[in-house]
Structure formats: structure tokens, C-alpha cells
Amino acid sequence: VRMCDGSSAPICRSVSDDGYHFRKDRSFSFHLSARYTGASARDPKIVPDGSGLYHMFVTTSLAGEKKGCLAHLISEDAERWEEVEPIYVAPGRDEPECSDYLEKDGWYYLIFSLRGKGQYRYSRKPFSDWQTPDNPEIPCQSVPKQAVWNGRIIFAGYRGNGAYAGTMTFAEAFVGSDGQLCFRK
């Protein structure tokens, strides 16, 4: 939710018993701290880390620095969330949107859309030390999402054609020896 009146946007959730039909959980809601520009908080992404800890990434900005970022929160139960250092801080005001996350062959990938272009960062560590690749753009244009299917990394995004959504785009990614992704459309 992005708040047009400047008030802090709540982080909410929906729940499902079957993964198909969802209902709003009206008992769950929280706000980011004043460290962040609360009105722009949106696009939460939750990632389990294998040790029982959940990580949430939220699109926002650092209030004092006026830099876009992905706030990083952690939880042991997906109910109570604690803010830690942002997982990514953009070089300017643009906010990294619609984040995604991938582990493949011992490399970790943080995926997001910045200024309408899909981008990624990579690391040997799951939640820090992000490197910018030689070419950070994902050739799926906006809002790239990935899935590992039969061992293959498939990205889907869209070409907006002047509006939101539009033509769906796909690309397959391969992990290079240095961890950078190589793409084939």
C-alpha cells in the first residue's frame, strides 16, 4: 500500500489455507520505524533462510538520506518483525521495487526494479556484501520475477508499451563462474 496523504503505509498480509484463495488478516499490521519514509513502504517480500529465520524486504527510502532502499526485517515466527540494516541502498532517490531473491550454485541474488528496469546484485553471502555485476540489467524490463524450473533459472517481466503491464517477457539465466548471471532470451 502506498499512502497518497503522506501518512505511514502499514505492512499487512493475506493468508490462505490452499495457496489459491486468500483472505486479509486484519489482526496483522505494522509500520516501519521513522528511519524510513513510511508513506512509500510497499512490495514486501519474505524469504526463509533455512535456519528458521524469516527475512522481509520492503521498498522504501531512508528518511534522512533521501535514498531509495530495501528495508530488511527479520522474524523467528513471521508475526513479530525486527528491523536490521537495509539489505540494499540505491545510489539515489529511486526506490528499488518489487524485490525478489534467489540462491543458486552457492551464489545469492537480490532482484528488483529500479527506474523501470529489472536489475540484480549478487553475493556469496545470503544477506550482505552485494556486488554490482558488469551489466546489472535483467533483460525482462520491468518487475522481473524468477523461478528455478527443472534446474533452469527463468525470469519473467513485462514491457510496458507506455503503460503498466503490457507484453510479457521471458529470459533464461545461467550462473557464470564468477557469479554473474548470463541471459538468453
Task: Label each PLM-derived region with a short phrase.
Residues 1-185:
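Carbohydrate-active catalytic/glycan-binding domains of CAZyme proteins
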